[in-house]
Amino acid sequence: MSSRAAVFILNQNAKREQGRKAQTANIKAARAVSDIVRTTLGPKSMLKMLLDPMGGIVLTNDGNAILREIDVAHPAAKSMIELARAQDEEVGDGTTSVIILAGEILSAVESFLERDIHPTVIVGAYFQALEEIVRLTESYGEPIDIENENDLQKIVSSCIGTKFSSKWGNLIVDLAVKAVKSVYKKEGDYVEIDVKRYAKVEKIPGGLLEESVVLDGVMFNKDVTHPGMRRYIENPRVVLLDCPLEYKKGESMTNMEFTKEEDFKKALMMEEEEVKKMCAEDILRVKPDVVITEKGVSDTAQHFLLKYGNCTVIRRIRKTDNNRIARVTGATIANRPEELQESDVGTKCGLFEIKKIGDEYFSFMTKCENPKACSILLRGASKDVLNEIERNLHDALGVARNVMVNPKLVPGGGAIEMELACRLMEFSQKIEGMQQWPFKALAGALEVIPRTLAQNCGADVVRVMTELRAKHANDKEGLYWGIDGNTGKIRDMRESNVWDPISVKQQTLKTSIEATCMLLRIDDIVSGIKKDKRGGAGQRGGDRGQGDQEETFGDQRDG
């Protein structure tokens, strides 16, 4: 009687965790990531010093920036870091809160898994709680007037008060509000505030931080192509191109064979004539002062544009910069010089000038009429300071944008989290069966934000949290009471003027709860061998004799 040999479906080098073990590993990984950024919450937060792979130093207390630099191996930890990135891209703020909340909510689940409560029951309770949280948060939102610049500055100031740049007063706040108002575009009910595309930050080391400014136009790191061209032009006529100003080369390789010297001269003459026609007839027909192109400009073209039109030419500009210039000057980017019309010329720019800052030349297009794009010029002592200020400015821009898109606020300082925790605890009494327990656990997990704020400024956590719970005991009575992040005492957030945009808070709560539910539903983690080893594994498999029974399907399929 022949016994059948065991068949291994998975590669023997693959590591596999299943069931409870996988879920516990995920919870531990998530908790480890949240512990890294826990001390960076609030105005008394600590900074983290990180060494990047290139040997540079990153000094920051921005949750996303910290996690971006950290190299982790566990897949659950990687998904937590992805949370911070998603939060940062979506609303620009709340990256630390979302990680701390997700870690705490997952920790609260561990005891239920030990009692053999099925993850699906917990996930169902969490989604039910999330619906209630969104409804309550919406009802607590207070509308504001975004036309009042003073109010807008107060809100942005309270949101970035925890950052490194808060030491310079309202400087970053003013820059953010001015930049967002510049790129704000409303057509009927449609509101567009594309900060990422149309508000460019230019960092130039040197000078004082107080010299930072939002330009009423744009700047870019380019100089003129010819030393004889003008570097200061008032009310310039601007032409933008997306094509090279040189003799057209064939799409494929082209060989030319000359038998007589005259033929070669004739070919050169034709080349020069074509460039002359392109410049003198097509471009100078619309009488431009400044010609900017994304591609190259030949010496011949520079000569003709300078000789016949006294034009200033800038070449090889980035497409993103070209789009910003089009927004501030009112010009249309042309793909072919012969297509240029009078309506394509930009006339909204009041001043074009080239300045030397440090060792580099920068082109400025300022005094623009109602610009819908801007450049933010940041000056500072060192690159480290500039990088941290830029991260803070990114958060401030995100907050200002969120408030203008959805002009509603909720109290900060952990007040809204404590209010939601108390209301969810009351709501859980109406729920019957096993789902009541995860509901209560989620309510308890929300308290992590005020608790962490109190911990980070060295307060008596137990006493402060008891006082805060007492304030929030009755519905809406203590809604505005939170933790003063500087003193660690409880305070009315209206007096402290600490507010959060409702969109940031809702996104934080949604992201953390949904991510928790996703990680809870994982019951199997398979980590195979690395890609570079797969080729070797496949070859070894091919050399085996017929008698070897091991089958490794997983590692040979993708070669």
Swiss-Prot record:
Its main location: cytoplasm. It comes from the Eukaryota. Keywords: ATP-binding, Chaperone, Cytoplasm, Disulfide bond, Nucleotide-binding. Disulfide bonds join C368-C374. GO terms for cellular component: chaperonin-containing T-complex. One of its GO terms (molecular function) is unfolded protein binding. Residues 531-559 are annotated as: Disordered. CDD domains: TCP1_gamma. It is found in: Cytoplasm. Belongs to the TCP-1 chaperonin family. Heterooligomeric complex of about 850 to 900 kDa that forms two stacked rings, 12 to 16 nm in diameter. Molecular chaperone; assists the folding of proteins upon ATP hydrolysis. Known to play a role, in vitro, in the folding of actin and tubulin. This is T-complex protein 1 subunit gamma. It comes from Oxytricha granulifera. The lineage of its organism: Eukaryota, Sar, Alveolata, Ciliophora, Intramacronucleata.
